[in-house]
Amino acid sequence: MKSEAPKPSTRQDIVEKADLLFYQHGFENTSFADIADAVGISRGNFYYHFKTKDDILKEVIAHRAAKTQGMLDAWALKGRTPIERLKCFAQMLIDNRKDIQRLGCPVGTLCAELAKLEHPSQGEAGMIFGQFRRWLAQQFVELGRIKDADVLAMHLLARSLSLIHI
C-alpha cells in the first residue's frame, strides 16, 4: 500500500494558493474570493482562517521566507564548495527563467508592489532579499573576498535579475 503525502491543512493550503496568486496577479489584484475559489472553500471558511488580506500577506511573506531559507540550506548541503553553492543559485535562475520572464522575480515583484502601495509589510518582504544577500555574501567570504563580499553579493543579485530578461 502506497502512503500518500499528508494533505496540507486548510490554512496552509490558503497560504500556498495565495502565494501563487499574489505572484501571478499581484497582491492588490487578488481578492478573498480568488483565493477561496483556488482552495475550494467557502468565503465563511476562508474568514475563519484569515480576517484581513494583510493577515494573509504576512503569512505569505513568512511562507516565502521559509521556502527561501529551505532552498539556501539545501544548497549549503548540496555544494561542497562556495563555487558549487553559487552554481546552485545560478541553476535556480535558469530553472525558473520562464516564470521569471513572464511574471518577474517573486520577491522583487511583491516588494515593488508593496512599495508602490506604501504598504507596512514592504520591509518584511524585503527581508527575503536580505536572506539571499547574506547567503551570497557568505559564499564570497569563503572564497576569500572578505572586504567586498557584500558588494559582490549585491552585484550578483542585481545582475541575476537583469540577466533573466536576456
Predicted regions and their residues:
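Amphipathic alpha-helical segments enriched in hydrophobic/aromatic and basic residues
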Residues: 22, 31-32, 42-43, 53-64, ...
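Hydrophobic/aromatic residues within well-ordered alpha-helical segments
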Residues: 53, 60, 64-68, 82, ...
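Amphipathic alpha-helical segments used for helix-helix packing
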Residues: 84-85, 99-120
